[in-house]
Amino acid sequence: MAARNSLTPQQGLGFFGLLILLCSAVLGKSQMCEVETGQTNIILDIEESRESFIGQPTTPPELPIFGDPDTEIALNLVFPKGQPIFQLNGKKLQLLQPLDRDEENLSHIVFQVSCTTRSTGKKRTIPIIVRVSDINDNAPRFMNTPYEVTVPESTPVGTTIFRNIQALDKDAGVNGLVEYFIAEGSPNSTNVEKYSADGYGTFAISFPHQGQVTVAKTLDFEKIQTYYLTIVASDRARNTADRLSSTTTLTVNIADSNDLDPSFIYSGCVSLDGACINPEYSASVPAGSLLGVLTVLPERIQAVDLDTINSPIRYSFASGMPGNYADYFQIDESTGVLKQTKAVDTSTAKKYDIIVKAEEVSPGPQRFTTAKLEIFVKPVDANPPVISSSQAEGYVDENSPIGTRVLDAHGNPISFMTTDADLSDSDPKPDYIYELTTPSFNVTGDGILVVNEENLDRDPPAPGRFKFQVVAREPRTNAASAPLSLTVHLRDVNDNAPKLAMVAPISITAGDQSESRLVTQVTATDNDEGPNAVVTYSIYHVSNNGIQKFTINATTGEIRTQGRLLAGEQYSITVQATDIGGLSSQAIVEVSVTPGPNTKPPRFQKPIYEVQVSEGAEINSTVTVVHAEDPENDAVVYSIISGNDLRQFAVGQESGVIIVIRKLDRESLTRYQLILKAEDTGGLSSSATVNIKVTDINDKNPEFEASTLPYVFQVEEGKAQASVGVVHATDADEGINAEITYSIPTDIPFTINATSGEILTAKELDYEQLNEYKFVVTAKDGAPDARLGTASVTVMVLDLPDEVPKFSDARIDVHIPENEENFLVATVQAFDPDSMPEITYVLRKGNAELFKVSEKSGEVRTIKGLDYESQKQHQLTIGTIENDGNGPGDTILLVVDVEDRNDLPPRFITVPDPVTVNDDQGIGTIIATLPAIDGDGTSPGNVVRYEIVGRGKAPKYFQVDPDTGAVRIRDELRKEEDTEYQVDIRAYDLGEPQLSSVAPLRVDVHHLLSSGNNEIKLDNKLESGTGMSSESIGLAFSDDSYTTSVPESMEANSTLKLIQIVNSKTSGDGPPAFRCEFVSGNGGGIFNLSSADHGCNLLLIQPLDFENKSSYSLQLRLTSHRYFVNPLKDTTSVEIIVQDENDNAPEFEFNRLRGQQDTFYTVVTEEMDVDTTILQVRATDRDSGKFGTVRYTLYDDDENRVNMPTSFFMMSEDTGVLRTAKHFKNENDFPLTFLVEARDSDGQEQGSHRTRARIVVNKLADINRMALSFPNAAPSDLRNYYTELEELLDKKTGLVSGIERMSSQKYLAKNGSVIENPAATDIWFYLIDPKTEQLVSRKDSIVETTLLEPAARSELNIALPRATAENISFPLERKEHVHKVKAAVAIDNEVFPFTLIAISLVILILGTIGIIYICISWSKYKNFKQRMRQYSSTNPPRYDPVIVNQQASSASETIANMKEYETQMLAMAVPPDVDDDLQLDFSAKNHAFSLDNVSYITHKENTNGGGQSSPSHSDATTATIATLRRHKNLNNASMNNNLAINNRQNTFNRTLEMNTRNNANPLASPPNGALSGTLTLGRIKHQNSNHYQNGAYNIDPTGPNNMAHAKNNAYSTMGRRGNTFGDVGLLNGNGELMNATLGRNGQLNNRLYGGEVPITNPLFQRSNSDHNHLSSTNENVSFGKRDYGQIGFSYLNDLDRSEVETTTEL
């Protein structure tokens, strides 16, 4: 037993193997439905959908479950909540609907998969988590827009001005992080307003993630008042190309601050930023007289606040010499009017020097300025002496000592000589006192001009050039000479050190050296010029050992940090400014370092870290270390915020060490992008990107770029080593594994560069031998176990023109019909082996009068028709110009065989004679034979057939043999009693077209008596005469083809044609023993065939339609079951041509925009002229020819309530263009409704079809017009988009729209004027209600709701190419003030002659009165001249203004060391000459009276209207006023019709007076007290400066300067440079007044309200809040940066700010 139960070793091994198999089976079954990763759930990743895409795969792509889903397991998805989102495809999940992670806040999807093991039926449910990855598909969206802020101009640089910018991005991770920056605006965005600009560069966003806007540059309200900042919000997608952004606009309004002193203003002052430098006034009083209000020169005392705050000004005397000046003079503290309170005598004082103070009345700092006032006490004057100089211009160095001589251009001293005409040669010469209008120079006793003041400064604000006048005065008599003008130029010397402005203490927050921050900017000024004024900056010293922590820009003076600054540190920076001469100055900048708020987040050392890690890296191994530093030195905490969804990495919160915490698998994921956040204790954070690349072994093949495959290259033949092309492959591996070498087979004529992949030719190629090569290029990487990649290459060899054309055929035989002109005979074709063939065909041999050859195509055509009967064959030899050889292939022989055509009709041989027959002759008896022949050369055109065509009963009793022409008796003649028959025999051929001739045969019948014994037996005698000798050829069609024309109106079941069958027999009572059938062409079953004796009938079964098909080609076949059918003629073709008929009516084409259903809509306007096109209707007719030609006619509607509306219009009969026939100004009964009729058949009445449509015409008024604005597109850009624009309007309104026109965009300026922008477009349109058929008012509720409400208007922002609709408004238009006078004169033949006589009498009377008036005026004028010659008086001198023209070189310069200049004015007539210098001419020809006639302007003389006259009424013109110009701009532009008035009386003869009447300016005093023009004394030389439009303000017509005849009124804006700005209105030739937006603030200074004229002189009724103080010359004045139009000084229009010129006039 023991032995029996023991196991042998062999049995033990077998049992052990069986046990292993059983365990394997059990374990294999138990693994089914298990998760391959060993987890209890499955985690997958999938990207969210882009729009509606659902094809994205999961990661991993299949469910990691053991088992084959087709054979081993069954899988089902279970969604406990909601609808299914995925479906299973094997183990792959496929989306059923798009995923939107952002809108649905969908971060993951949880569901289950049910897995059933098929073998056991065991079921298991596995949870599945699908994580939805975000993609960057949402752009940031700004919140709470629009953005706008107002900041004062004094805001320091670095101040945060706006913190409310916020944009949200719906994406997650870095895709949802938003950063902000300021972008440069478009050029057109800042050109709308004068004082607006793009804020790019002026403002900045220091921290992009916060979006806080700070000031980057100093603000200046006087320059820019509004900034537009383009704010861009961008997300931070990993790939910068995928980043999305949006933009908005921040409007920054600059508020003015009280930072400018007041300034005196008057004509000719030197200005610096709108402020007069060294203002000086002068006045004179006669000794012993009390004048009251004094006349001040150059103008009344006036000061203004340079800030827009416009504070009131208080005037006072600050000081004066002599000290008793206050006893004699006082100044009004409000108006600045200077008064004399007590008479003064020359013994008391001859001159008073007073300092006038102008102080702002404001709550803040009391800013003030001063001016010098000189009051002269005038003695009695005598005859003046005459002074002359050696030169008019001199030169001297600045800072020259007193007594330095002034030299001329040649180095000679300038000397003076004085003579007196009153002194004889024997009289002793007095010692004259030379008086100069400048204290800077003097004349020595010997008459030499020398320097009279120390430290004459050429540098600003000094003028640099002195233009003054010299007067020689007698000490005893005080008689003065006429003024002599001189100019002295100061030459620059480097005598000014740069001056550094004081810098307030600076506070700066602590920071590290990673950023260079601006501390401040120092500015130095050097009053020298040229190289002497070039300043360089340097840091001289820094306290606290901080010399290495600050730098300064040597050119700009910007001080910036460059080292780490700690809170609590203080530094004193000594800055030195040095010019080229070594002169320097220093200033100290105090800098304090403050800790500041926690405003800066930690910053990573690098924004992006690139790291590599092997996929075999151990867990907890270090990947890299990131480090961020906080500017405030706060502790930093690190975290991973994105990219670590698989939890394979971790970062140390304090150390920043990134480690691996799970095994990496490069085959699953090759790269990771982690977003790390560094956050300080204050909650501020920043992020950095860590790109981790998982390295791998060489497991990738080189791959050629798929977009370039297959490679196809081209190379010219005959070139060795020519470049063919470059192939390129890439290897996903790295290092040596990615180094690729290229190779190609060695048996081809090409080589390849193993490194670059460039393929070259190894030898010269021949296109003719082989024009294409195909081979394979191999790319191999550099790894030891190299991998390969291949690509196919095709090289096309390009041919060069080295071959001549050859013909492949030697001969071509063609057949063409005769009589065909321009018939295509054949097309010959030569072959040029070159790839760019050049072939020109030519006829070498042949009849050139009958044939021609196309040079390019090789087409051979007939020139005229050929004649078969004349010549049956033609031979042509054709060659090419490129090949002049005669060998084989050089030419081709074209043999043309002419085919005969049926062009000759049959002709009877003889004229048949009458035939007499007895009535007893039997049926079939031949009574005559009429043979005919056909001249055509071929069959069937020369085959003749015969038939009887009439007349009467003849066809009943006679018949003709169709082949022979034999006429037989057909029926018993006894049946009729007729004795004569006319038999017409028609001989026709079988050609196409069929031709025929007819011959008449008269048959006389002789009737015989009938006999019963001689009864005629009518047995079928024809049987004996019809032997079938022709059956040998069988049945056949008579012709190969037939053609017939059929009208399209032919009825169904009609016979179209009988097709004859040759050799057919009469079938008797039965059907014929043959039949015809269709082979092709009858696909629609339109035709049918029926058999008949000797032929087949072609029948029409269905109706024809020419418009659908105009011809049919049928193929027929002949068959017979009894008789033989000739196989050569058993088929034929039938061509059926359908003839068109008028069976279609016209149909109107209703334009969607102006028509609806059966109605056309259009409009007219009141201004529309006669014969204006308003509409074009179109109708189409499907018929052809004249049947499709449409004509148009207008008809009145019977139900129309307006009589004859068509009388207002006319329509072109041919084109359908509707034009106006009348004017519509007085017509109000609209809409007009009438009919238009379209008639075909070219308008013929008979047989035509008609269609009518309605036309509705409305009258368009302004209330119906609307404008759709496109601010970014010109009208030329939108010309081609009418349809899109009108579709937009129809869609939005549901009405019928029409576009009236396109024009440049117009908008209202602040002053009410219309401004035109040619770069934008206004689309003028109107709307018609299709229900009422009337125009819709723009105030209609439907317009309000569909277009004008904000919600509806936002929907109009649809975009065309390069254009976007903005809004809808009423259109603006410049109203042309052109009065069109149209007089409708009805001439009465009886009254008209008397009317002409009456008009003639009135003209005669008025002419006589005018002549009398002229004579009286001339007499008075002569008397006046006579009195003037006899009158003489002495007068004291007058003082003239100092015209100091200077423009500030920089905004930082201040008015200091103001010079005082003594001035005098000689009140003499001033002509409007153009000389630039003051010239005096005392020649005899210019003086009809003595110098004593010069009368000075006094208060008394002009107030009372008596006294002496001003010399402005005299012809003695002794001075020339020059208009100072800098840029030659037309500052005092004349826009009137009369542009060339040469008025020598352009200086007023009126005195400066204070009139109690309401005069705008004391220079003008008309008798009625109405407001007159401002009169500028001796300055303005143009008629536009001193007038209003005639009749508007009661101008004194006698005033020589009022220019009462000027037809137009100009409102001009004259800026500091004299330019006419873009907003200035001009006066056009039609007299149109165009208002302008003027002044620095763009305010409306020229507003006129009704007929009232506001007070322009601030001396009377001035209110600081009233902005309607107008310039009485209607000219706004831009003085520097300020608008002085409200003050009433017209001369400021002609000011030019010369930088170096001072003009003093006497």
Swiss-Prot record:
Subcellular location as annotated: Apical cell membrane; Endosome membrane; Cell projection, Microvillus membrane
UniProt-listed Pfam families: Cadherin
Residues linked to a glycan: 105, 188, 442, 553, 620, 753, 1053, 1088, 1108, 1311, 1367
Membrane disposition: Single-pass type I membrane protein
Record topology, Extracellular segments: 29-1395
Induction annotation: Up-regulated in the adult anterior midgut after the ingestion of bacterial uracil. Strong up-regulation detected 1 hour, 2 hours and 16 hours after ingestion, whereas no up-regulation was detected at 4 hours.
Domain Cadherin intervals: 68-142, 143-264, 277-387, 388-500, 519-604, 605-704, 707-807, 808-908, 909-1005, 1038-1148, 1156-1270
Gene Ontology biological process terms, A to Z: apical protein localization; calcium-dependent cell-cell adhesion via plasma membrane cell adhesion molecules; calcium-mediated signaling; cell-cell adhesion; cell-cell adhesion mediated by cadherin; chorion-containing eggshell formation; follicle cell microvillus organization; homophilic cell adhesion via plasma membrane adhesion molecules
Superkingdom field: Eukaryota
Phenotype upon gene inactivation: Females display reduced fertility as well as defective eggshell development. Ovarian follicle cell microvilli are abnormally shaped and display a range of defects including decreased length, reduced number and an irregular distribution pattern, leading to impaired vitelline membrane formation. In the intestines of 3-day old adults there is no formation of endosomes and consequently no DUOX-dependent up-regulation of reactive oxygen species (ROS) in response to the ingestion of bacteria-derived uracil.
Cleavable signal peptide: 1-28
Keyword list, A-Z: Calcium, Cell membrane, Cell projection, Endosome, Glycoprotein, Immunity, Membrane, Repeat, Signal, Transmembrane, Transmembrane helix
Topological domain ranges for the Cytoplasmic compartment: 1417-1706
GO MF term set: calcium ion binding; myosin binding
Cell membrane among keywords: yes
UniProt comment concerning the protein's domains: The extracellular domain is necessary for conferring apical characteristics on the salivary gland membrane. Necessary for regulating salivary gland membrane expansion and tube length, but is not required for cell rearrangement during tube elongation. Sufficient to promote the outgrowth of follicle cell microvilli and the formation of microvilli bundles Sufficient to promote formation of microvilli-like structures in the salivary glands and the follicle cell microvilli bundles. Dispensable for apical localization. The cytoplasmic domain is necessary for the formation of uracil-induced endosomes.
Main function: Cadherin that functions in epithelial morphogenesis and the intestine epithelial immune response. Essential for female fertility. Regulates the length and organization of apical microvilli in developing follicle cells and salivary glands. Function in the follicle cell is essential for egg development as the microvilli secrete eggshell material such as the vitelline membrane. Acts at least in part by regulating the recruitment of the myosin ck to the follicle cell microvilli.
Name by which UniProt lists this protein: Cadherin-99C
UniProt source species: Drosophila melanogaster
